[in-house]
Amino acid sequence: MPFNPGKKLYISDVTLRDGSHAIRHQYSIQNVKDIARALDKARVDSIEVAHGDGLQGSSFNYGFGAHTDLEWIEAVAGEISHAQIATLLLPGIGTIHDLDNAYKAGARIVRVATHCTEADVSRQHIERARELGMDTVGFLMMSHMTTPENLAVEAKKMESYGATTIYVVDSGGALSMDDVRARFRALKAVLDPSTTTGMHAHHNLSLGVANSIVAVEEGCDRIDASLAGMGAGAGNAPLEVFIAAADRMGWDHGTDLYTLMDAADDIVRPLQDRPVRVDRETLALGYAGVYSSFLRHSEVAANKYGIKTVDILVELGKRRMVGGQEDMIVDVALDLLNKA
């Protein structure tokens, strides 16, 4: 589908899910309410709510959340009147039972997330979401780790299971603008014209906003972003920055920029115990193509064993570790320690 500058962009906020990684999943109920209220006032289309690793992500491996997914979802449901609540489910971490409970708590959109070459495992969850009448999204993580053509094959699988939107997910913040363009062209070549597409960018190479703009130019319908870029690694595409850029380009986004700017600086940024920015460590994520949520885990391991976080991240990239392999971070740290 060619670029249509007149279409309304769907703005999908991820501050209350991906943003959870930035503070080790420690949002309080009051934090969640304050952020949701501001986002709803700004009239974003959806607000994603869950542990950073999705429904039931709270665990020893991924980090325990301050509250349950359902407590967070219910808190948001009580604060919003415009936006819909989205949630994230990674098959193997979350189950159909968890999806049912999230729906009862107020979630009406689910993004079923798999590694970019493993769409097969999403079938049951996508089918159940459609049975519930949810807006059902296929979410292909670490999209830089396969070719555009292979990504399109996986996207087609998710579409065949019932997903009505397919996302290119740059979990490592490693895609260039040409990479994004190639992936959307490959998806558009095989997906049904009625199937919408989305872009989930990370800012590890400072390309989060640029990649989101390129995606829209290639016909992308939905853009993920977060207040102050709150997210794993160097964060997601900063929502207020993307909206300002979209506004200058004359695109219809339907949100209030100044409300988003205030929320980013007054509510979200003060919560960051580690600045969400491009620095030595987060740049290494994008450069090495590493899953962005490995950052905080790697920093803990580096501090414990007296080695550099960057060295751990680069080695994880060499080993092509993917989301869900957080347990390997300590193994890598110990290997590096033994080689020192």
Swiss-Prot record:
Substrate binds at R17, D18, S171, H200, Y291. Its EC number is 4.1.3.39. The active site is at H21 (proton acceptor). It is an enzyme of class 4 (lyase). It catalyses: (S)-4-hydroxy-2-oxopentanoate = acetaldehyde + pyruvate. Mn(2+) binds at D18, H200, H202. Residues 9-261 form the Pyruvate carboxyltransferase domain. The keyword Lyase applies. GO terms for biological process: catabolic process; L-leucine biosynthetic process. It holds the Pfam family HMGL-like. The record marks R17 as: Transition state stabilizer. GO terms for molecular function: 2-isopropylmalate synthase activity; 4-hydroxy-2-oxovalerate aldolase activity; manganese ion binding. PROSITE patterns: PYR_CT. InterPro entries: 2-IPM_HCS-like (IPR050073), 4OH_2_O-val_aldolase (IPR017629), Aldolase_TIM (IPR013785), DmpG_comm (IPR012425), DRE_TIM_HOA (IPR035685), PYR_CT (IPR000891). Keywords: Aromatic hydrocarbons catabolism, Lyase, Manganese, Metal-binding. It comes from the Bacteria. NCBIfam families: 4OH_2_O_val_ald, PRK08195.1. HAMAP family: HOA. PANTHER family: 2-ISOPROPYLMALATE SYNTHASE 1, CHLOROPLASTIC-RELATED (PTHR10277:SF9), HOMOCITRATE SYNTHASE-RELATED (PTHR10277). Belongs to the 4-hydroxy-2-oxovalerate aldolase family. This is 4-hydroxy-2-oxovalerate aldolase. It comes from Cupriavidus pinatubonensis (strain JMP 134 / LMG 1197).
